[in-house]
Amino acid sequence: FSQQTIPPSAKYGGILTVTMSPGDGDGPELMLTVXXXXXSACVPVDFEEVVVSSNADEEDIRTSLDLYANVIHCKLGDGLFLQCCKNIANPTATLLASCMMLDHLK
């Protein structure tokens, strides 16, 4: 195991910036380990840390991280997506498709 201090040049576009949000509990310790492992392996990644706690307001987190989603909850669908998945998986022996109906929306 060799210890390099200068990461090798990346093949596609140089060093990538990755946002890391350690959170609460075990998160900070795990993220420290991830960052140390990535630095030891000379992975071309630069970590940008964003501090978020469980006490933070959801809207504040989404606004500060520029996260927006257009989510439409629907209980019933026509099954087209599932049928397309099954059609794609059918001729391929290595791809398996299964269906599970979940109803957790109010």
From Swiss-Prot:
Cysteine pairings via disulfide bonds: none
Any one cellular-component term (Gene Ontology): mitochondrion
GO molecular function: enzyme activator activity; isocitrate dehydrogenase (NAD+) activity; magnesium ion binding
Keywords on record: Mitochondrion, Tricarboxylic acid cycle
Compartment(s): Mitochondrion
Activity regulation annotation text: The heterotetramer and the heterodimer composed of IDH3A and IDH3G subunits can be allosterically activated by citrate (CIT) or/and ADP, and the two activators can act independently or synergistically. The heterodimer composed of IDH3A and IDH3B subunits cannot be allosterically regulated and the allosteric regulation of the heterotetramer is through the IDH3G subunit and not the IDH3B subunit.
Domain of life according to the entry: Eukaryota
BP GO annotations: isocitrate metabolic process; tricarboxylic acid cycle
Protein family per UniProt: Belongs to the isocitrate and isopropylmalate dehydrogenases family.
Subunit structure: Heterooligomer of subunits alpha (IDH3A), beta (IDH3B), and gamma (IDH3G) in the apparent ratio of 2:1:1. The heterodimer containing one IDH3A and one IDH3B subunit and the heterodimer containing one IDH3A and one IDH3G subunit assemble into a heterotetramer (which contains two subunits of IDH3A, one of IDH3B and one of IDH3G) and further into the heterooctamer.
Functional description taken from the UniProt entry: Regulatory subunit which plays a role in the allosteric regulation of the enzyme catalyzing the decarboxylation of isocitrate (ICT) into alpha-ketoglutarate. The heterodimer composed of the alpha (IDH3A) and beta (IDH3B) subunits and the heterodimer composed of the alpha (IDH3A) and gamma (IDH3G) subunits, have considerable basal activity but the full activity of the heterotetramer (containing two subunits of IDH3A, one of IDH3B and one of IDH3G) requires the assembly and cooperative function of both heterodimers.
Name of the protein: Isocitrate dehydrogenase [NAD] subunit gamma, mitochondrial
Gene designation per UniProt: IDH3G
